[in-house]
């Protein structure tokens, strides 16, 4: 579970190892399906907590970086682990609850629902926590962004994970015809419908404006004492002056120097 959690984080920026999803989620479905009747709640809680920790510790490892901006806070950087543990516990509790009350629902449909529900609950608790959404997995693919435009982040997250779980159906071949009918009715047909709508909207949208966008991720070395705040600011200013783009975006860890 710890390994699967870590591998799941590689689907997200900046890695975007998209094909991994077709290995990770069928494996997770197989584990859950084989153990859902035999595992105790305590054992399940431990397993899902390990999955969450493996996922969040790599995916949100950068959260510690703001602690290194100032000398006064760098000794408190381990505080970021509290966020990792809290998110892991939330994910684990939701997994246990949904699996307990959804015993008769195929695991193929439960897994995407669990992750999407977790995404929603975390966004409510943390007032729109912006980093935990599986819709980010397709953010580097302009051809798949129609899903975000048409569905929004939550439904896009569900669809992405549901597609990743597809190999599980063919591996187990349990209730294959029934699950394929559900999949066609609730997933495939809506996607085809929205693809057609997306193509039509592009054809009808005659007013377009192209702008140049440049994104900066200036990862200053925290252990480099020669990099004073003034030097970091000068580096940011130099990048701004050299850029010819219409819109510039800097990462949040560069804001303290602006």
What are these regions (language model features)?
Residues 197-258:
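Soluble catalytic regions of membrane-associated enzymes that act on cell-envelope
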Residues 1-201, 256:
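Membrane-embedded alpha-helical bundles of multi-pass enzymes
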């Amino acid at each position: 579970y710890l390994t699967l959690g870590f591998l799941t984080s590689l689907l997200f920026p900046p890695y975007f190892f998209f094909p991994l999803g077709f290995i990770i989620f069928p494996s997770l479905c197989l584990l859950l399906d084989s153990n859902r009747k035999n595992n105790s709640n305590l054992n399940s809680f431990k397993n899902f907590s390990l999955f969450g920790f493996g996922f969040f510790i790599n995916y949100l490892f950068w959260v510690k970086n703001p602690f290194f901006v100032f000398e006064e806070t760098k000794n408190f950087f381990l505080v970021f682990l509290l966020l990792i543990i809290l998110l892991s516990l939330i994910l684990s509790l939701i997994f246990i609850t949904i699996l307990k009350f959804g015993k008769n629902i195929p695991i193929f449909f439960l897994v995407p629902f669990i992750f999407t529900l977790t995404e929603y609950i975390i966004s409510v608790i943390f007032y729109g926590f912006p980093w935990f959404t599986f819709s980010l997995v397709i953010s580097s693919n302009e051809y798949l962004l129609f899903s975000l435009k048409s569905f929004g982040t939550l439904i896009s997250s569900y669809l992405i994970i549901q597609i990743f779980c597809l190999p599980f159906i063919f591996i187990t071949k349990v209730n294959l015809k029934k699950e394929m009918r559900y999949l066609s009715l609730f997933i495939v047909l809506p996607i085809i419908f929205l693809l057609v709508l997306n193509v039509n909207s592009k054809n009808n949208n005659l007013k377009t404006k192209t702008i140049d966008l440049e994104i900066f991720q200036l990862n200053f070395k925290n252990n480099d004492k020669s990099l004073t705040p003034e030097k970091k600011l000068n580096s940011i200013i130099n990048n701004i002056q050299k850029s010819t783009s219409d819109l510039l975006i800097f990462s949040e860890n560069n804001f303290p120097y602006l």
